[in-house]
């Protein structure tokens, strides 16, 4: 399938509305888990549990880095699964039963401080990240297996991104508000953990239940090992460039996400400022999403991605002038970043879904979960590394950790580091991603004859007839 959404595309059969909406509910989980740990956890460790910045960064980074190994394995296991209920939905249920309680326990730490507190949080966070991988990898795979029509995949992803915006807005605004309600006390963080766990459960169980009515028009074929999965990715250059571009942009977003609470507290002068900052970031997500979708249809997804990436870079640079221009300038810069962020949430996923379809046509293999497992592993590592990178900025600039009962003044170097880490560093990362976006070319479909049958290695579920290879379509060739 072409990576740009053309207005003259041949329409395919639509999925039931309840399936599209129900699938989107899963983003209440993915959006919340991608937001709250990155937003809250580092600050919780350094400003509530008195964990030194470098140690706190390791406690946040290492459990998420574990997902780099877990995600591809989950994808391979899911691909081979013959569980009752299909290859994907049972994993959604397992994740739904385990992630919410584990998340609540992260913020229910016993009265520990320093390295001991960091160890407790790291272990619980590692278990929670594993449970999240069990849910997320099959969840991200499902659109490519529900339909082979790119327009219908766009509609599915539209619901997903819409609920993603709701999840980020709710969790990003409510989690800090609850955590700060009692002066950053451990009790307020425990309450926050329970509230977020309820939101996670709502989205995860909702997606599991409603996708029972989803058709299965395709089935992925797993690569036999992690090495084989990486080899498959190396053989598909469009996927490599696309995944690399998104990894750098996710790292930039992860750095910003880790720094926003510090930016609110020390640059804007109020911990509560994180709530209006999130309103400025996520408000545009819902409002401008149709505009990004329209731009993708008119100019192609890659052209729209260029616009979103450049706008994100400009907003990040503008944010660096907040100390001189005042809070109003900072909020305006975050609005620009929010408009760009809406595009960055939609467009790479659309390109990924169509790139997976192109891989089927070229190779005759259905490896959606293999590629999405690698994609989510890279994304997870990027967001985790974002918190670690910002923690390193704090450590290098002399940030002083404290507990909830004893606040300390920060040196001027640390205050400057917070502002630069929130603005200049993400801008540099976004700029580097533009080279990979430039190298990306929409894949050409045509190496597999449309009349040919799928290779014997493609598994055919007993409940489904053999699936034909998608028809040839013309797009640009990789350089």
What residue ranges belong to the model's regions?
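Membrane-embedded alpha-helical bundles of multi-pass transporters/translocases
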Residues: 2-451, 476-479
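Intrinsically disordered, low-complexity repeat/linker tracts enriched for polar/charged residues
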Residues: 450-451, 455-456, 460-461, 465-466, ...
């Amino acid at each position: 399938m072409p990576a740009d959404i053309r207005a003259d595309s041949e329409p395919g059969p639509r999925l039931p509305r309840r399936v599209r909406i129900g699938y989107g509910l899963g983003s209440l989980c993915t959006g919340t888990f991608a937001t709250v740990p990155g937003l809250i956890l580092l600050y919780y460790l350094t400003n509530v549990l008195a964990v030194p910045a470098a140690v706190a960064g390791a406690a946040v980074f290492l459990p998420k880095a574990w997902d780099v190994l877990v995600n591809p394995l989950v994808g391979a296991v899911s691909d081979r699964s013959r569980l009752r209920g299909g290859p994907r939905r049972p994993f959604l249920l397992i994740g739904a039963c385990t992630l919410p309680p584990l998340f609540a326990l992260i913020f229910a730490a016993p009265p520990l401080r320093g390295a001991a507190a960091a160890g407790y949080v790291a272990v619980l966070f590692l278990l929670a990240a594993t449970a999240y991988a069990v849910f997320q990898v099959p969840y991200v795979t499902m659109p490519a297996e529900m339909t082979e029509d790119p327009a219908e995949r766009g509609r599915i992803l539209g619901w997903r991104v819409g609920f993603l915006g709701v999840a980020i807005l709710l969790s990003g605004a409510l989690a800090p508000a609850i955590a700060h309600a009692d002066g950053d006390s451990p009790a307020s963080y425990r309450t926050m953990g329970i509230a977020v766990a309820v939101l996670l459960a709502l989205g995860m169980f909702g997606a599991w239940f409603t996708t029972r009515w989803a058709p299965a028009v395709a089935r992925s074929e797993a690569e036999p090992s992690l090495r084989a999965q990486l080899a498959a990715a190396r053989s598909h250059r469009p996927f490599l460039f696309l995944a690399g571009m998104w990894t750098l942009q996710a790292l930039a977003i992860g750095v910003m996400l880790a720094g926003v609470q510090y930016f609110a507290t020390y640059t804007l002068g109020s911990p509560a400022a994180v709530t209006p900052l999130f309103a400025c970031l996520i408000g545009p997500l819902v409002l401008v999403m149709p505009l990004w979708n329209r731009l993708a249809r008119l100019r192609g997804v890659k052209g729209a991605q260029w616009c979103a990436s450049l706008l994100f870079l400009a907003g990040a640079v503008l944010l660096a002038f907040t100390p001189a221009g005042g809070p109003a300038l900072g909020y305006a810069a975050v609005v620009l970043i929010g408009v760009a962020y809406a595009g960055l949430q939609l467009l790479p996923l659309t390109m990924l879904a169509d790139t997976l379809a192109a891989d089927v046509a070229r190779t005759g293999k259905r490896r959606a979960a293999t590629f999405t497992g690698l994609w989510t592993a890279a994304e997870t590592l990027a967001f985790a590394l974002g918190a670690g990178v910002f923690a390193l900025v704090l450590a290098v600039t002399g940030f002083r950790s404290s507990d909830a009962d004893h606040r300390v003044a920060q040196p001027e170097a640390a205050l400057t580091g917070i502002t630069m880490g929130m603005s200049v560093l993400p801008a540099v990362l976004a700029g580097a991603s533009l080279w990979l976006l430039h190298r990306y070319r929409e894949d050409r479909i045509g190496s597999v004859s449309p009349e040919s049958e799928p290779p014997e290695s493609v598994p055919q579920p007993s409940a489904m007839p053999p699936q034909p290879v998608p028809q040839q379509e013309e797009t640009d060739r990789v350089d």
